[in-house]
Design a protein with these regions (language model features):
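An N-terminal alpha-helical hairpin/helix-loop-helix interaction module that forms a charged
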Residues: 1-154, 167-228
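Conserved beta-strand->loop/alpha-helix structural units within folded catalytic cores of enzymes
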Residues: 154, 159-162
Length: 228
């Protein structure tokens, strides 16, 4: 549907105006759903817990009973919170448990030799990118898309989902912008510094500023529907 129209901020508002009642109903349901699950997630996974979690509290591959962060975000209780991150292989999380070999493996599906050191860096990288993102500190070298040494810089679905969860209010929306980069560039162009994360935040700011009657907490659902 979208490729038949000229995508723009003005077109989005025109589309919203024509479908206002239906969109507001959907957005209200989505907002309530996200608010409830977000509160539960934050009780279970306060940001500081990322630094102290064990490897089995992180990895996917050990089954539902493990209640790991990666399982909960992709397949478990929080799979539909803000945005889904399913698809691809378990290696997208950096470290995962391989049932066939009974080994922890990295994103290249290789067995990890220095496991403690490797997992320590992963935890630190995940914590730092979320901590800086929720402060909107996009000038930080972490967010230099070409030079960043943070291993989560390219994992935009997971990072966007966590930014939506850990920020107060609704300064981000639940869409993995990199999956439709050209589409979202019609709103705000993506830059190397800040990448999809700054772009996501700027889109919310732009739409909210241009059309103040659109509540940021409901915008995520509306923008997602518009992008279909």
């Amino acid at each position: 549907m979208m490729n038949k129209r000229k995508v723009s901020l003005e077109d989005f508002y025109k589309w919203y105006s024509l479908n206002k009642e239906e969109l507001l109903n959907k957005a209200t349901v989505g907002e309530k759903f996200n608010d409830k699950l977000k509160e539960e997630f934050l009780q279970e996974w306060p940001l500081d817990r990322i630094l102290t979690m064990s490897i089995d509290e992180y990895v996917i591959g050990k089954g539902q009973q493990n209640k790991s962060l990666c399982y909960a975000l992709e397949k478990g209780k929080y799979k539909n919170l803000f945005l889904g991150i399913s698809g691809g292989s378990a290696s997208k999380f950096g470290i995962y448990w391989n049932k066939k070999t009974n080994k922890y493996k990295d994103q290249a599906n290789n067995e990890i030799s220095e496991l403690d050191q490797r997992f320590s860096k992963l935890k630190s990288d995940l914590y730092e990118i979320i901590k800086e993102g929720i402060r909107f500190n996009f000038e930080n070298p972490i967010f230099d898309m070409k030079r960043s040494t943070n291993e989560f810089i390219g994992r935009s679905a997971m990072v966007t989902k966590l930014l939506c969860i850990y920020t107060e209010g609704a300064p981000f929306f639940g869409v993995n912008i990199n999956s439709q980069k050209e589409f979202w560039n019609h709103f705000v162009s993506q830059t190397n510094q800040g990448g999809p994360y700054l772009q996501n935040h700027k889109i919310i700011e732009l739409v909210s500023k241009t059309y103040p009657e659109l509540e940021p907490s409901k915008l995520g659902t509306m923008l997602f529907e518009y992008s279909k």
